Amino acid sequence: DSCKVPHFYTNKEKELCELENPLIFMSVSDIPNVRKIQEILEYAIKSNRSMLLIAPLESQPLTALAMNKAKGNIKVNVIDPPSFGLKRKDILEDLALLVGATVFDESLGDSIDAITPDMLGSADKAVSDKDGTVLVVSEKSKEVQDRIEYLKTTLAKEDHAVMTKHLTDRIALLSG
């Protein structure tokens, strides 16, 4: 998805947010306040790394992050997870595999109080504008290659137009 808050732009003229070597947190569950992600934010600051949050954040954590970015405490960007429902979960799982993250999901029993740095992934670069976000990952794991092959096999058997499009989009996302 696209950059949510202009305060996160690193290039205001081009309306871009570029993060080099960001840590990446992903969630399908709402993050109600900044305390719930405080441990991973502190980890990013101590590690001198930027942070990309692909998560539905409520207004309090968004405001707190914008203030901390404005003060120069952390380089951060927040984008909404792409798509909806099961498609959202599929796409986030694919992205997580690509960047080495764990998707936070309360519906699967994850505790909002147990968001830790070991859930974070990383990319070489993340660039967001008003139209979307591109993650640059130079090294693709064997698991990513296996997922691409699995999706291609599934696609070859699929005849429903909506599912064909969804599978094609997922293959494109993982293939870069």
Regions found by a protein language model. Give the residues of each.
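Long, structured protein-protein interaction/assembly regions in large complexes
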Residues: D1-G176
